[in-house]
């Protein structure tokens, strides 16, 4: 499995600004206080800010706000356990394979492909030694999907002895994938 690490940018800087709402002497005690946070640039990280209970004091009391920050890494973990197949390796890896072969037709921009990716990875681990799993990027290898009539992705095809036996289109539940794969176990 690939390991991802997250790094954060320089810390957040805070500025406070006080403005007088009214210029009349009787209302001079009314002021508006604003907190500005200058956030660092972020690439794939979300910075969550939350106020501490001490900052939720009454409006009439002087406020001291303490800011607590947490950086959360939301990089989707991907695995490299599933071998990649392309137009040039298709015949040797899929058509000439002994036993059942599952090919996941996907693209990096496809949202449903990203949704089903963890399921396919789990199934590849579960069926290790029984079924071979491959991934084919339809953007990088457009000939093979065209040859097999792949019109939408994600599409999962099951091959046995070089022949297409089953096709599953779309992001389906794990139970649907499992029931389709179980039919082709040796």
From Swiss-Prot:
Which residues are the active-site ones?
A: 110 (nucleophile), 113 (nucleophile)
Feature: transit peptide: 1-72
**UniProt-annotated site: Contributes to redox potential value, residues:** 111-112
Gene expressing this chain: TRXM2
* Residues the UniProt record annotates as site (Deprotonates C-terminal active site Cys): 104
Return the PROSITE patterns for the record: THIOREDOXIN_1 (PS00194), THIOREDOXIN_2 (PS51352)
Residue ranges of every copy of the Thioredoxin domain listed in the record: 73-186
Subunit-structure text? Interacts with G6PD1 and G6PD4. Interacts with PGL3.
Q: Name the species this protein comes from.
A: Arabidopsis thaliana
GO cellular component, alphabetical, reads: chloroplast; chloroplast stroma; chloroplast thylakoid membrane; cytosol; thylakoid
- Please report which protein family the annotation says this sequence is part of: Belongs to the thioredoxin family. Plant M-type subfamily.
Instruction: List all disulphide bridges recorded for this chain.
Output: 110-113
Under the heading PANTHER family, the entry gives:
GEO12009P1 (PTHR45663:SF11)
Respond yes or no to whether keyword Hydrolase is given for this record. no
Which Pfam families is this protein grouped with?
Answer: Thioredoxin (PF00085)
Mind telling me which Gene3D superfamilies this protein's record contains? Glutaredoxin
Kindly list the organism's lineage.
Eukaryota, Viridiplantae, Streptophyta, Embryophyta, Tracheophyta
> Which key words tag this protein in UniProt?
Chloroplast, Disulfide bond, Electron transport, Plastid, Redox-active center, Transit peptide, Transport
Q: Per its database record, what is this protein's job?
A: Thiol-disulfide oxidoreductase that may participate in various redox reactions. May activate NADP-malate dehydrogenase.
Question: Subcellular location, in the record's words?
Answer: Plastid, Chloroplast stroma
Q: What is this protein called?
A: Thioredoxin M2, chloroplastic
Q: Which GO terms describe its biological process?
A: positive regulation of catalytic activity
Q: State any single GO MF term.
A: enzyme activator activity
């Amino acid at each position: 499995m690939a390991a991802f690490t997250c790094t954060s940018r320089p810390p957040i800087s805070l500025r406070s600004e006080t403005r007088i709402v009214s210029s009349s002497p009787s209302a001079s005690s009314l002021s508006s206080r604003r907190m500005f946070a200058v956030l660092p640039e972020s690439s794939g990280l979300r910075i969550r800010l939350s106020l501490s209970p001490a900052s939720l004091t009454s409006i009439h009391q002087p406020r001291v706000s303490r800011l607590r920050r947490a950086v959360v890494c939301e990089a989707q973990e991907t695995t490299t356990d599933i071998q990649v197949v392309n137009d040039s390796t298709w015949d040797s890896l899929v058509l000439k394979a002994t036993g059942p072969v599952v090919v996941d037709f996907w693209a990096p921009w496809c949202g449903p492909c990203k949704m089903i990716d963890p399921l396919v990875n789990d199934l590849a681990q579960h069926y290790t030694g029984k079924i071979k799993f491959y991934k084919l990027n339809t953007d990088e290898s457009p000939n093979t999907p065209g040859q097999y009539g792949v019109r939408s992705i994600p599409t999962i095809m099951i091959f046995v002895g070089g022949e297409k036996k089953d096709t599953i289109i779309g992001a389906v539940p794990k139970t649907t994938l499992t029931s389709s794969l179980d039919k082709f176990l040796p």
